[in-house]
Amino acid sequence: MRILAVDDDRAVRESLRRSLSFNGYSVELANDGVEALEMVARDRPDALVLDVMMPRLDGLEVCRQLRSTGDDLPILVLTARDSVSERVAGLDAGADDYLPKPFALEELLARIRALLRRTKPDDAAESVAMSFSDLTLDPVTREVARGQRWISLTRTEFALLEMLIANPRRVLTRSRILEEVWGFDFPTSGNALEVYVGYLRRKTEADGESRLIHTVRGVGYVLRETPP
């Protein structure tokens, strides 16, 4: 697996190179966002590890530009700022995950593994689309529709909706969703799940459709026609 690591701090770049290479990844480095976009266009990696604060073009703008072209390259954002607003900004820009600095190597590796797992095709996936009410999801073609309206989802949004639609009317705990969709236990203070539920609600209700994804306070979420 090829990882492109992008950071304007040479020491951080070299640390990422050593750590990732030691764990079996092929690693390429970029100094800033402009160079990163050029390298992705020239030879697309399997995942992107991206710092936020960089000269010329920051990490969030790199995310936006890639997503605006429909590129679903797995992106892990590294940020020295760990406020809720900063994390939400990263997810809004199109990042699949975020990791505050300083970080433990074990957590970096776990998050990269989780990202790469979500990109692998499921050979055993059912070819028949799943549906609930007027919402349909095809795990093979990765097409999603609400009635006759097609819905474009990011990789993480799709994984979350797929879990919900595979468990209709079942209350799924927050911890179970985080473990299955993100591939590891998120800190309880993290709000990535809430952010992505918000994204899914906006997209599945964009034409005024009724809400299907409901919050079960203190527990998690459920896909059902009416509030619990």
Curated annotation (Swiss-Prot):
Keywords: Cytoplasm, DNA-binding, Phosphoprotein, Stress response, Transcription, Transcription regulation, Two-component regulatory system, Virulence. Residues 2-116 form the Response regulatory domain. Phosphorylated and dephosphorylated by MprB. GO terms for biological process: regulation of DNA-templated transcription. It is found in: Cytoplasm. The modification 4-aspartylphosphate is found at D46. It holds the Pfam family Trans_reg_C. InterPro entries: CheY-like_superfamily, OmpR/PhoB-type_DNA-bd, Sig_transdc_resp-reg_receiver, WalR-like, WH-like_DNA-bd_sf. Member of the two-component regulatory system MprB/MprA which contributes to maintaining a balance among several systems involved in stress resistance and is required for establishment and maintenance of persistent infection in the host. Functions as a transcriptional regulator that recognizes a 19-bp nucleotide motif comprizing two loosely conserved 8-bp direct DNA-binding motif repeats separated by a 3-bp spacer region. This is Response regulator MprA. It comes from Mycobacterium leprae (strain TN). The gene is mprA.
